[in-house]
Design a protein with these regions (language model features):
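Acidic, Ser/Thr/Pro
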Residues: 22-166
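Hydrophobic helical h-region of N-terminal Sec-dependent signal peptides
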Residues: 10-15
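C-terminal motif of bacterial Sec signal peptides marking the signal peptidase cleavage site
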Residues: 17-20
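Bacterial N-terminal signal peptides that target proteins for export
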Residues: 1-9
């Protein structure tokens, strides 16, 4: 009988040890997709970009940033240029160029390399601007408003008001 008792105890111990050694299958690795992240959306808001009167000799650049997750940012604004002061007459003598550039285009512009612009107005002294910018995806995007004086001999005064609606 002692042998049966030892055998029963050994069998019981093996069952306890065997039950304790069972492993659960490993959990699958979590894959995080960037679109799973929730971030505040700028939809329904506006951002003032530029409201200024300045003297334009050769060119002037104004940077602004579109926040992440802006699906259809819309640039709206006005500019008027004058050959003398901001309250003078605005005619062909006050014509300037206006460009909207992304960072790559701006780097080309600054480096005097040929490049395209997202939006261009040439030879204008009074212009309304309504332009839909590309969506910003998951990162903020920087843009530049560039005012250029094709007549480098005579300075011009430029009045601007620009905003972005999301």
């Amino acid at each position: 009988m002692p042998q049966h008792r030892h055998l029963a105890m050994l069998l019981g111990a093996l069952l306890v040890v065997g039950a304790g050694c069972t492993q659960e299958p490993p959990k699958p690795a979590s894959t995080i997709v960037p679109s799973d992240h929730v971030a505040p959306s700028p939809v329904g808001t506006s951002q003032n970009v530029l409201e200024k009167t300045f003297t334009l000799k050769k060119s002037a650049e104004f940077a602004f940033e579109i926040p992440a997750h802006a699906v259809q940012p819309q640039l709206h604004g006005l500019f008027a240029s004058f050959p003398g002061d901001a309250h003078g007459t605005s005619d062909a003598n006050a014509d300037i160029d206006f460009l909207v550039l992304n960072e790559e285009q701006h780097a080309d512009f600054v480096g005097n390399r040929p490049s395209e612009a997202l939006f261009t107005v040439e030879d204008s002294n009074n212009q309304a601007v309504n332009f839909i910018l590309p969506a910003s995806q998951s990162q903020p995007v920087k843009y530049y408003l560039v005012f250029r004086n094709p007549d480098n001999k005579h300075s011009k005064v430029v009045k601007t008001t620009f905003r972005v609606d999301f």
